[in-house]
């Protein structure tokens, strides 16, 4: 369980350390959301590609990717079944409708995960902003104190 810290009681170096920690946490959460969005986009594209699988496209010629920049000609033979990469080199054969349902579930799951992370990211941003404001206040206090001491010495 996280403990509560009163940032007004922290000195400038401690505030700097806290700010750096919050920077790292914000970066981690932002990266996590970005990675989830990349995977979600992949699933959305895969689901959308299933729309070309209909009887009118059966037998049509297409380009089959061997790499991201190399293709070979092919024909669309079976428009009712697809192989889905389920990870770690495993593929599962599904009907086009089952594949759409599979991708929809994956997209929904990723959306929920991003929705769980978003509030934490916003909270960390707000905490970082509060720390930065407190740092600014402390710097202003130190500057004013230094100016007052310089005036007294003069």
From Swiss-Prot:
Keywords: Acetylation, Chaperone, Nucleus, Phosphoprotein. It is found in: Nucleus. GO terms for molecular function: amyloid-beta binding; unfolded protein binding. It comes from the Eukaryota. The modification N-acetylalanine is found at residue 2. Heterohexamer of two PFD-alpha type and four PFD-beta type subunits. This is Prefoldin subunit 5.
């Amino acid at each position: 369980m996280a403990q509560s810290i009163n940032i007004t009681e922290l000195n400038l170096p401690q505030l700097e350390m806290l700010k750096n920690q919050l920077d790292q946490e914000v970066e981690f959460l932002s990266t996590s959301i970005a990675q989830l969005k990349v995977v979600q986009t992949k699933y959305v594209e895969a689901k959308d590609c299933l729309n070309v699988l209909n009887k009118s496209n059966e037998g049509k010629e297409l380009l089959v990717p061997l790499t991201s920049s190399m293709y070979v000609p092919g024909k669309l033979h079976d428009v009712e079944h697809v192989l889905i990469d389920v990870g770690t080199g495993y593929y599962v054969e599904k009907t086009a409708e089952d594949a759409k349902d599979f991708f929809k579930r994956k997209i929904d799951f990723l959306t929920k995960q991003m929705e769980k992370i978003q509030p934490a990211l916003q909270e960390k941003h707000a905490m970082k902003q509060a720390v930065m404001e407190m740092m600014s206040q402390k710097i202003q206090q130190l500057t004013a104190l230094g100016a007052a001491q310089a005036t007294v010495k003069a």
